[in-house]
Amino acid sequence: MASILNQTQELQESSKVLGHLRCENFFLFPGENTLSDGLRGVLYFLGLAYCFIGLSAITARFFKSMENVVKHSRKVVTIDPITKAEVITYKKVWNFTIADISLLAFGTSFPQISLATIDAIRNMGERYAGGLGPGTLVGSAAFDLFPIHAVCVVVPKAGELKKISDLGVWLVELVWSFWAYIWLYIILEVWSPNVITLVEALLTVLQYGLLLVHAYAQDKRWPYLSLPMSRGDRPEEWVPEEIDTSKDDNDNDVHDVYSDAAQDAVESGSRNIVDIFSIHSANNDTGITYHTVADTPPDSATKKGKAKNSTVFDIWKHQFVDAITLETSESKKVDSIYLRIAKSFWHLLLAPWKLLFAFVPPCNIAHGWIAFICSLLFISGVAFVVTRFTDLISCVTGINPYVIAFTALASGTSWPDLVASKIAAERQLTADSAIANITCSNSVNIYVGIGVPWLINTVYNYFAYREPLYIENAKGLSFSLLIFFATSVGCIVVLVLRRLIIGAELGGPRLWAWLTSAYFMMLWVVFVVLSSLKVSGVI
């Protein structure tokens, strides 16, 4: 009986790679395994796309909460040495460089990180590491570097130039990002081929801490630990307060599913509230973050607290109201009946996600930390569903799991990175946030996204079997890393040439911007094609 069960398990595992056998598992509804593989593949692809929409929506909530966290200031009381009077100032709690690496990069990369971690937990007890996690993160790194650069370079208006102001911090982040891929190649091919030891996994994770320390040292210009490079002008605020509301984005409903809730909360009788809001994008790509300040005298602390609490509950209540409202205030302003129907249909499509994510508390509670944590939990849940869909797609289509991992799955889970960098390229006066988010996300993907899952598996295998973790397709993964390293050099060289010739990494003459964008996309296609051919055994 045991031999029969083992043979059945082997057949099911082989079906995931070869696609010859029927996949017996079902996920959407009972009896779906009786459908044809082609129909099941279509259903799973649609489900995967719908999950990406959900990831975009919940990431918008994450961005709002993150902005509130970074904007938090602490009161500092000092004594003037001359007048002996108290001087009250407010200083930012977060250093912007650390916030970029630990909050922005970690948050936008959280779908990929959670996918890899969930995959590692599911594979606990297995001597071979799951291929979905590392493949997704390598593909995500390629998507971050090439398509996101391709988008950011054409985002500024025609003739507008946006360059990196702090080249020292960017170079530190870039060097650590390149070293991450070199390090992966060393442990996969040189140090212990096809094996990940506990020491290797631990060293991978610890390098993330070294990145934080080195980047902070460069930002503060610590001697002996920083590059002696001057810093250009940089904005005082991490998120600019000035906005341009003249733009209208048709994709608004994906990234800002709560703007109407906040607006209705303000319009519904809260007349003693002055709204001081900032959005992460001029066209509402990621939604509005509201800061409510009671329009009362400073000494009316009790009234101020009551007004604040009332507004918090009003906004939270209207999040649920907005989730079940098909026609928003913006769609009512549209003259075309067809566009109004399309917008209503889009709201109907988003309604389940909006209703689910309405449980995330408003971002102005506890400086955004509660919403921050809740958003991460929801992202993890959606990421788990994504792993199930990708497993089933690989099973019914016979596509190699690695190919799915660094193409469709990596592109979809990197959508938050694309949104964040695009917004930064639009709103920031410099290119620091847009480009730094790419390099920081890639570093986080490697040191945390690959290091933590491998650390989980190696620790378990060490105590359970006294064995290391084996990599089933190390050559394919190593080949992808080599291709990515080669193409990324071509990307960085073009950015440096744009800096020297045009004067900025982003923007410039429209023709040159579009040519640069096309070149970056070509590099991504080269990476995807060569990596897919390698893991499929063609080359």
Swiss-Prot record:
PANTHER family from the UniProt entry: NA_CA-EXCHANGE PROTEIN, ISOFORM G, SODIUM/CALCIUM EXCHANGER
Function as written in the Swiss-Prot or TrEMBL entry: Vacuolar transporter that exchanges protons with Mg(2+), Zn(2+) and Fe(2+) ions. May control the partitioning of Mg(2+) and Zn(2+) between plant organs. Could also transport Cd(2+) in vitro.
Isomerase listed as a keyword: no
Single GO cellular component term: vacuolar membrane
GO biological process, one term: transmembrane transport
Lineage top rank: taxon: Eukaryota
Recorded topology in the membrane: Multi-pass membrane protein
Location relative to the cell: Vacuole membrane
Annotated family: Belongs to the Ca(2+):cation antiporter (CaCA) (TC 2.A.19) family. MHX subfamily.
Record bears the keyword Transit peptide: no
One Pfam family linked to the record: Na_Ca_ex
Alphabetically ordered keywords of this record: Ion transport, Membrane, Transmembrane, Transmembrane helix, Transport, Vacuole
Major site of localization recorded for this protein: membrane
Protein name: Magnesium/proton exchanger
Residues spanning the membrane: 38-58, 98-118, 135-155, 167-187, 195-215, 341-361, 365-385, 392-412, 444-464, 477-497, 511-531
Tissue specificity of this protein: Mainly expressed in the vascular cylinder.
The species this protein was found in: Arabidopsis thaliana (Mouse-ear cress)
